[in-house]
Amino acid sequence: MNTLYLLQFGCLIFMVINAVLLVMSRLYVKWENKRYEHSRWLIVIAFFMLAFQYLAQIQGGIRASGDDLGAIVNMLIYTPSFALIAYGIYNIETTQPRRRHMVIVSTVLCTAIYLTCAIGYLHSGSQHIGWWLYVMLLFYAASVVYDVVMISREMKKRKKMLERMAANDIQPYLRYSRVSLILLCLAALVMPFAILSTTLLIILGPMVLCALLFFTLTFISLGTNYVPTESLLDDEAERIVAQRYAETRNGGGIFCNLFRSRTVG
């Protein structure tokens, strides 16, 4: 067995274990939070998608046949998988109008990667798509950077909001937020370069796996530390933001209503 096969097999087992841990931890949650549970299943789906990708790589010998083919398959699966994990985090951090915006942008970037791959295949007439691979890499990097920036912004806003609204200890939440952002930054810095070279993938792959395991354990810890008070804060915050969003769409909300009342008077 060569090193590449062992790495891919280890990644396959690792992703399945992480997915099972997330599913089994559902049994130990004291208080259910709908947004957290939604995020849990999104991340579980992402881990199973990654596991399927490693299984396909092993069965088909895709990475072994060429770094470019391995990179193409990686980007076709990594992009939606990473988007699901990022949205799982973002779903906990922000409110409905902003979540919708992230879904649209992530979908557009994923579609751009798949279209680029299809155009490259038609243009070259083979699976070796040449310089179109770097166009795919550009869209992949843009997707990762976008997810990191959006999550970072929402974490800062939510931290300030919770400090104003909550008198209880929010250290578990802050710990989860920091770890999630660090892991996303790690993926943003490492993966676009690692997937182009099998040697780099073998060196950096175990580091990314350890980071993902830490993320999984921290995410599970967040779920077990949820209390009803935090759920109420989430609902109240979402209600306030949704109300402001509706007022903005109605043309200024309270200020327009004040102007109308003075006009009528």
Where are these regions (language model features)?
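Interfacial "cap-and-anchor" motif at the non-cytosolic start of specific transmembrane alpha-helices
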Residues: 169, 175-237
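Membrane-water interface of transmembrane alpha-helices
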Residues: 18-25, 81, 143-159
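Membrane-embedded alpha-helical segments of multi-pass membrane proteins
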Residues: 73-84, 139, 207-210
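Membrane-interface helix-boundary motifs at transmembrane edges
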Residues: 27-42, 65-67, 90-103, 126-129, ...
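Hydrophobic alpha-helical transmembrane segments of multi-pass membrane proteins
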Residues: 8-28, 38-63, 75-83, 108-118, ...
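Extracellular-loop-to-transmembrane junctions of the mid-late helices
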Residues: 2-14, 114-153, 193-205
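The cytoplasmic-loop to transmembrane-helix boundary for the fourth helix
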Residues: 90-120, 131-140, 165-183
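Membrane-proximal linker segments that couple transmembrane helices to downstream signaling/catalytic modules
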Residues: 218-265
